Curated annotation (Swiss-Prot):
Substrate binds at G78, H231, D232, T233, N291. This is Rhamnulokinase. Disulfide bonds join C348-C365, C408-C412. The active site is at D232 (proton acceptor). It is an enzyme of class 2 (transferase). It comes from Yersinia pestis (strain Pestoides F). GO terms for cellular component: cytosol. Keywords: ATP-binding, Disulfide bond, Kinase, Magnesium, Nucleotide-binding, Rhamnose metabolism, Transferase. The gene is rhaB. Pathway: Carbohydrate degradation; L-rhamnose degradation; glycerone phosphate from L-rhamnose: step 2/3. Transmembrane segments: none annotated. GO terms for biological process: glycerol metabolic process; rhamnose catabolic process. Pfam families: FGGY_C (PF02782), FGGY_N (PF00370). The keyword RNA-binding does not apply. Its EC number is 2.7.1.5.
Length: 485
């Protein structure tokens, strides 16, 4: 089986082999490639052709090796999309969610439709780049494009289409758009109308697990292409070895997503005021979670400072005074500033914290601030569920940053387990194995993952200065009142 896992900064083609007798699961990285935002005609866009080419090269390599493939699946980040014309050809490049075209659009939607009405319909966190606001911006700013559009496909659906020629709309990723009605599981006609787009661009989203079509290889293979849980976080959660019903997960990468699984969505006012999202998951579950800006801040800062030795930077950051400077990582100013280091420094200056000037000080500011935000979100989630979190499972690339994860354990006061690193890839494979009938269900698959990919564990440390630091952070991170209206 092949899992193609696309993140906001890189992509990978991974080969998985499963031996049912021993319930052994192995992964092999076929290729890894960078995925970066490009500026074209004043817009920040994804180079979707380069992504597709890298995927095809990985698949062709496996085909040339004579490896018989059972299935293929693709997962990616959410909310971004590709427009197709009536001939099935792409219209322009897909614009990145970090593009500035949506500035002010969400606030106008909240005023016009009411935050309460939008949230009750969708159960989705208010983020300025949700597809709802991207489409409203498109219809306001480039209405001439709309007449040529026949279909809108989210990123993994588009790439599945390119491999098979078949259109598909997968549910877990569709749920991130803030266009899906949480009661019906279908596109909300009133929100589509507000976005300025017709319903015939879409079909009702399907649950993960169906075969979309087939990829025909140069050597004659006809490989089923499976609609996995195509949102990368949905796949990551599918592979998270949650130990009990009170455990929570933190999918840690470019974004950090903290939450828990629920059989029902939480769309009451307390969830809305906490800006909690209810995204679709496997087996009809909901991923009740919150998006946190995550390691994007560090990625941008290290790029600007031209730092390649990340372990050394983390070691230097660990020697800096704790919580000397704090920011709110979820402040919209950090979505895509011209200069991240300068933006962090300005935020510290404005809130009368010492300005971090060295790379180590900047990194420590980011790590401390993320840990504080993890604590805040963990408390919000526990309050919403009505019982404390028993354990936190950190999955994804951020598993490898043990210093940040120890800060998280300390701030949250929770025992933490770390792993698997390739959680999105493994969740992608899990959807394929369940679809193929090789694995019974998600619970069974999580046992397989836990047995094949050992976890690492951390316990919280006491910190006598923590209470004062926590009060300082709380003053930075109050949610806007308009979310509750």
């Amino acid at each position: 089986m092949v899992a193609i896992d696309l993140g906001a900064s890189s992509g990978r083609v991974m080969l998985a082999s499963y031996y049912p007798g021993q319930q052994q699961l192995t992964l092999r990285e076929v290729c890894r490639f960078t995925n970066q935002i490009k500026s074209i005609d004043g817009s920040d866009v994804w180079d979707i052709d380069a992504i597709e080419q890298s995927i095809r090269e990985g698949l062709s390599q496996l085909d040339s090796e004579g490896i018989a493939l059972d299935s293929i699946g693709i997962d990616s980040w959410g909310v971004d999309f590709v427009l197709l014309d009536k001939q099935g050809k792409r219209i322009g490049q897909p614009v990145s969610y970090r593009d500035s075209r949506t500035q002010g659009v969400m606030a106008r939607a909240q005023q016009t439709l009411g935050s309460n009405a939008i949230y009750r319909r969708t159960g989705i966190q208010f983020l300025p780049f949700n597809t709802l606001y991207q489409l409203r911006a498109l219809s306001e700013q480039q209405p001439h494009l709309l007449a040529d559009v026949a279909h809108l496909l989210l990123i993994p659906d588009y790439l599945h289409y390119r491999l098979t020629g078949q259109l598909n709309w997968e549910y877990t990723n569709a749920s991130t758009t803030q266009l899906l009605n949480i009661e019906t599981g279908d596109w909300d006609s009133d929100l589509l109308a507000y976005a300025g787009v017709p319903a015939h661009w879409f079909a009702k989203p399907g649950k993960p697990g169906n075969t979309i079509g087939y990829w025909h290889s140069a050597n004659g293979q006809q490989v089923p292409v499976v609609a996995v849980a195509t949102h990368d976080t949905a796949s990551a959660v599918l592979a998270a070895p949650l130990i009990d019903a009170d455990a929570a997960y933190l999918s840690s990468g470019t974004w950090s997503l903290m939450g828990f699984e629920s059989g029902t969505p939480l769309t009451h006012q307390q969830a809305q005021c906490s800006n909690i999202t209810n995204e679709g998951g496997a087996e009809g579950r909901y991923r009740v979670l919150k998006n946190i800006m995550g390691l994007w801040l560090l990625q941008r800062a290290t790029d600007e400072l031209q730092i390649d030795d990340l372990p050394q930077l983390i070691e230097q950051a660990a020697r800096q005074p704790a919580c000397r400077s704090l920011i709110n990582p979820n402040d919209s100013r950090f979505i895509n500033p011209p200069n991240m280091c300068r933006e962090i420094q300005n935020a510290c200056r404005e809130h009368q914290f010492p300005v971090p000037n060295t790379a180590a000080q900047l990194a420590r500011c980011i790590f401390d601030s993320l840990a504080m935000l993890y604590r805040q979100v963990a408390q919000e989630l526990a309050t919403l569920r009505g019982r404390p979190i028993s354990h936190l499972h950190i999955v994804g690339g951020g598993c490898q940053n043990q210093f940040l994860n120890q800060l998280c354990a300390d701030a949250c006061g929770l025992n933490v387990s770390m792993g698997p690193v390739e959680a999105s890839t493994l969740g992608n494979i899990g959807s394929q194995l369940i679809s193929l009938g090789e694995v019974a269900d998600v619970t069974h698959y999580r046992r397989i993952v836990a047995n094949n990919f050992p976890l690492h564990h951390l316990s919280p440390h006491d910190n006598s200065d923590f209470a004062a630091h926590w009060l300082q952070f709380q003053s930075l991170s109050q949610l806007p009142k308009e979310l509750c209206i």
